[in-house]
Every structure is written in C-alpha cells, then in structure tokens.
C-alpha cells in the first residue's frame, strides 16, 4: 500500500537562548518520555557517533500491545538543527526537521517541520483531519517540553 503524506509545521517559542535551547533539545535521555507526559512509554538511547543516535521508543497501547518506533537522529550543531527519521513503526520513513533560531532579548524558537507517512488512511479527507490532529498533538508536546526547559535551565 502506498502511504499518504501528512505535512505540517509549527513554531514553538522558548524563553532561553538559541544555543541553550538546542543543547537542551538534543540531549536525549531515557526519561524524556516523562517530560512529554507519556506515561505508557519508554525510551532507550543508542549513541552511534558524536552527533548520530538511534532512539528506541516503546509505547504501550490500550490493548497492552507494545509499539516500538526506532528513530535515526542526526544533529547539526553549527546550524542548530537536527532531523529524526523513523526507521520502524507505524510511520516508517517519516522525517521531522527541527530548527532553532535566535530571537531578540536572548529568546529563541523552534521551527518543527513534519513529513509523516500514514499507511492506514487512503482518503484525502482523512489525511487532512489526521494532519490537524497530529500537528495539535506534537505542538502540545513541544509546549510541555518548553516549560520543562525553562525549569531546567533557569
């Protein structure tokens, strides 16, 4: 089956400098899921090289089935950018781009760009509805992460 493409983007503002935001965001740890209020999820981090890692995220659904997503993360410090490409899971081969930029007064923002592949929906209407829903969910997680970042870096 050919997947449908779901594209969306949003901006999340941070009350910390671009460099601090970038370092905080790319410091992947096993307890990251708790920061996003993902109670039924775990994360394992495998460092491949200094700026390359694989995330093994496991989510337990309502039927108590485990869904594992393996993500290849490539970090570009000079650009304050990183990518996350799904290697396995329900959104296999989806890719997400994260770009941190400086704002005035020592603040910054993240531009989140998603190209998500949906193997379940085949109708344009379903894809548009799902795009809005996943964008809202991802934006909510980044809002939580922004709050945690402020607590952690102040």
Regions found by a protein language model. Give the residues of each.
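Hydrophobic pocket/interface hotspot
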Residues: 21-25, 72, 82, 110-112
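Hydrophobic ligand-binding cavity/cleft-lining segments
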Residues: 1-50
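Short, surface-exposed coil-to-beta transition loops
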Residues: 7-9, 55, 64-69, 91-97
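Beta-strand/loop substructures that line and gate deep hydrophobic ligand-binding cavities in soluble
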Residues: 85-140
């Amino acid at each position: 089956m050919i997947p449908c493409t779901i594209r969306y983007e949003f901006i999340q503002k941070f009350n910390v400098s671009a460099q601090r935001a970038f370092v905080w965001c790319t410091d992947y740890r096993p307890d990251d899921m708790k920061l996003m209020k993902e109670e039924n999820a775990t994360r394992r981090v495998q460092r491949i090289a200094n700026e390359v890692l694989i995330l093994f995220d496991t989510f337990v659904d309502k039927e108590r089935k485990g869904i594992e997503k393996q993500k290849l993360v490539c970090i570009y410090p000079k650009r304050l950018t990183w990518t996350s490409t799904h290697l396995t899971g329900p959104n296999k081969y989806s890719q997400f781009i994260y770009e941190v930029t400086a704002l005035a007064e020592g603040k910054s923002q993240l531009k989140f760009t998603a190209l998500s592949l949906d193997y379940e929906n085949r109708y344009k209407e379903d894809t548009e509805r799902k795009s809005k829903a996943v964008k809202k969910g991802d934006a909510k997680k980044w809002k939580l992460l922004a709050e945690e970042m402020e607590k952690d870096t102040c």
